[in-house]
Amino acid sequence: MATYHSTRSHEAPLTSKEAIRRGIAPDGGLYVSDELGCTQIPLAGLSEMGYLNLAREVLAALLTDYAPEEIAACVSEAYEETFADAEITPVRRLAPANADGVPTHVLELWHGPTSAFKDVALQMLPRLMARTGSNDGTGDEKIMIVTATSGDTGKAALAGFADAPGVGISVFYPEGKVSRVQELQMSTQEGANVAVCGVRGNFDDAQTAVKQIFADRELAERLATQGVMLSSANSINVGRLVPQVVYYFAAYAQLLRSGDISCGDEVEFCVPTGNFGDILAGYYAKRLGLPVARLIVASDANNVLFDFLTTGTYDRKRPFFTTTSPSMDILVSSNLERMLYYLSDGDVELVSRLMGQLADEGSYTLPDELLSKIREVFACGWADEDEVARAIKACWDENGYLIDPHTACGYHVLSHMPAVPGSKARILLSTANPYKFPRAVAGALGLFCPPDDFACMQVLEKATGTCAPTQLAELQDKPVLHTDVVDIDGMASFVEQAAGGLK
């Protein structure tokens, strides 16, 4: 049975259920398993497997203490009736993004209830967490999910956990630094167990504060007297990360079925990412046997990952830019820690030292040997705001296909980076429906943008012949239920107050 431990220590190994329930390790590290890759997902027969079967295979390989019937139930509950496309994450073919002629495909990850890729994992995580109850007499313990969001995680987590028994959720978002649609998705969320709060600061401020909340032993002791423990719905929780591995295999299976590739062909994935979780799932897929030639990191103007992969120095001491791709406006990429662990061959002392330097000094520099190993797997590129707008227009002009600003970062990077030799296809992960960012998309197409985002949606619909998802268009008529805004140092009190209302 696979066990999980912190990226910063081999002590106190846990089962996957325990790791999911806790969310983050007591020393601040993230949970990893040294058995990653010991089980391989067979490529033979992959083309015949639908998404639900693939999900059962991948989850069984990574969450080994869940019984097969538990995994089957989680998969059924998460995906059978909650996604608008039968493929769950369908693949669309575009014209080659680069002059090298290698086919380009888009993996649409936004057909879930909140129109963002986070739905794939956050429809699954509550089901996994519901089956982590202990048998040691503490089964009545309640869980308070605490999550910082740069835009999409918040609504997807709220939708997944709303009214879940024995669970509450507190979501923090940076006030004024998410799109109007994203903010309304959160502030109109219904549910007796949900709490939403804006924070005065950026996402990194909020995410750092959440980690400090998890490390606050006095707070944990006070909550324990109420029968409450804290956990996370961010991708720092391994139960959030693992479900994302599935759609890499699903994309490959669809290309096999369409005849675009043959079994064993290598493919590239380009991933718009800020917190490194989505692309880390691709690395997990590679370790599980998927023929991944290269994983390409696409960043926006907050290009800390580009600089890191280019120079080997991670430096968060830099200007923060508010862009049209708010879910990538991040300067501290939490999931990078897991990648460092695996590519340093499990060197917990090195990882602990680097993370300490990042916290205390704001930067760290990798050993040359480790940087070389990382570059064998990961490439990188980035797009500024003008390049993002041009990419949205180019994709529409060349393909009649709308993309959001996050996806546009990846489209730009692919168009300026030839495929690695031997790669038979390039797959761009599309992380959000373009109607979540109607103003940016309409502006990029040169359309008139009314002051109201919902009027922008209508302009976009008329000009392109596409339709806004119903769940987004209806937001303008929903009452705002959450109006709290706090300073960063008020977040812990907000969580404690929300936990006091759990039933």
PLM feature spans:
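PLP-dependent amino-acid enzyme catalytic core
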Residues: 1-503
